[in-house]
């Protein structure tokens, strides 16, 4: 297996279908990548809805995993434990990717290199209007000036999370996300594997699309509500 795509999901809404549809439309051969969709902290009706969608698309390369334990870090760890790919890419369930996302990242893949792509952010319902996004700004800085200027906090921002990258599994090995952190677990994980980085390769194409306002706010509200419910019943 060449690539494992790991998607954590909690009480997904319609945006998950967009995410899965974008992976269904990949130009990269479907038998060369697997999708590990980890439904965490919930089960029905979401599990049945996902199974119905996958059946309709005949997406045989998707492995749906359900766990009652809530948490994006736990979900990603489950995906890593099950991953068979030589390379890993993480995608949030409210983001989607261009048809050539996997193909173009893999074309530049090397065992000692992380391939990175250009993120495009917009508000829900207005994809034609690109919004300012700190990750995009960090990418532009890295792509245009990294070879001329010293490393700075602007560069580090791009590595604050695992998405928008194709990471060699040999970088990760047995390292996992720390489930004890409520915030900053992405940063810690990237720091843990940073000792393996030798080269970075930037693809200056819009391959990763993220909705930075409406969907992320809704996801945060869902997670806060879930935590409150847990606190009430414990």
Feature map (PLM): residue ranges:
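Cell-envelope/extracellular polymer assembly enzymes that use nucleotide-activated donors
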Residues: 2-4, 22, 34, 188
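A conserved hydrophobic helix/loop-capping motif in glycosyltransferases and polysaccharide synthases
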Residues: 3-19, 26, 38-40
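Acidic donor-binding segment of Leloir-type glycosyltransferases
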Residues: 20-66
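Glycine-rich, basic loop-to-helix element that forms the pyrophosphate-binding segment
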Residues: 67-83
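Catalytic metal- and UDP-sugar-binding loop of GT-A-like glycosyltransferases, i.e.
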Residues: 68, 91-93
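Short aromatic/hydrophobic "clamp" motif used to bind/position activated sugar donors
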Residues: 88
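Donor-binding/catalytic cores of nucleotide-activated saccharide
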Residues: 93-107, 112-184, 188-200, 210-224
């Amino acid at each position: 297996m060449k690539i494992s795509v790991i998607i954590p999901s909690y009480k997904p809404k319609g945006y998950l279908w967009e995410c899965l549809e974008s992976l269904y439309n990949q130009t990269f051969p479907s038998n060369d990548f697997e999708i590990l969709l980890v439904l965490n902290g919930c089960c029905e009706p979401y599990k049945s809805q996902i199974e119905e969608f996958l059946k309709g698309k005949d997406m045989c390369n998707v492995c749906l995993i359900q766990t009652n334990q809530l948490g994006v870090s736990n979900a990603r760890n489950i995906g890593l434990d099950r991953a068979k790919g030589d390379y890993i890419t993480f995608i949030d369930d409210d983001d989607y990717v261009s048809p050539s996302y996997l193909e173009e990242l893999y074309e530049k893949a090397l065992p000692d290199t992380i391939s990175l792509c250009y993120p495009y952010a917009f508000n829900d319902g207005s994809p034609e209007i690109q919004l300012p996004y700190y990750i995009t700004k960090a990418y532009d800085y890295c792509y245009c000036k990294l070879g001329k200027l010293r490393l700075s906090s602007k560069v580090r921002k791009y590595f604050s999370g695992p998405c928008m990258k194709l990471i060699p599994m040999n970088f990760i090995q047995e390292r996992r996300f720390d489930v004890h952190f409520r915030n900053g677990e992405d940063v810690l994980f990237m720091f843990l594997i940073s000792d393996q980085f030798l080269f970075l390769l930037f693809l200056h194409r819009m391959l990763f699309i993220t909705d930075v306002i409406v969907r992320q706010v809704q996801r945060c509200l869902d997670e806060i509500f879930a935590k409150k419910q847990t606190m009430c019943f414990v």
